[in-house]
């Protein structure tokens, strides 16, 4: 048998196997993000983000995957599920860039959708205490004393300028 044919055959087999390799973390995350952008494929996005987290739990994109899953849960009306996902993000990735937002969203969802005012107060206080330099800490400072009150009682709008 011709050694060149053997070499070319092996090269083709190796190339074929390489093209069937597992997607990179970035590729899998991008596929999930694309699915999440289409409201008709949210279940597909959930499966892809969960697959990403199973395969790459220590990847730098893992906290963002949990954040995206929480956002999808909110879109689907599963507010308790969203809180669970945000809590998971806080416990598994406490050093990530998403923690202040996750803590804030727990507070917001607990107040606005679940009616758990005590948990909302605690979550807003954690934003203030644990992330004092976050832009969301300023919002939490404003919202905390008003938890449970209707906005019309505490939101002050500037009077519209009056024509002379």
Residue map of PLM features:
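Acidic, polar-rich low-complexity tracts and alpha-helical solenoid repeat scaffolds
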Residues: 3-4, 16-164
């Amino acid at each position: 048998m011709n050694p060149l044919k053997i070499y070319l055959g092996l090269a083709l087999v190796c190339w074929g196997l390489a093209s069937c390799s597992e997607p990179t973390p970035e590729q899998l995350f991008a596929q999930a993000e694309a699915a999440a952008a289409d409201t008709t494929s949210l279940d597909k996005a959930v499966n892809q983000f969960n697959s990403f987290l199973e395969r790459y739990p220590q990847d730098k994109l893992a906290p963002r995957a949990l954040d995206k899953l929480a956002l999808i849960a909110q879109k689907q009306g599963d507010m308790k599920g969203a809180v669970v996902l945000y809590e998971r993000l806080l416990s598994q990735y406490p050093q990530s860039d998403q923690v202040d937002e996750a803590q804030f969203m727990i507070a917001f969802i607990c107040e606005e959708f679940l009616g758990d005012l005590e948990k909302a107060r605690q979550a807003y206080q954690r934003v203030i205490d644990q992330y004092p330099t976050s832009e969301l800490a300023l919002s939490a400072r404003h919202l905390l004393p008003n938890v449970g009150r209707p906005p019309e009682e505490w939101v002050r709008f500037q009077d519209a300028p009056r024509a002379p």
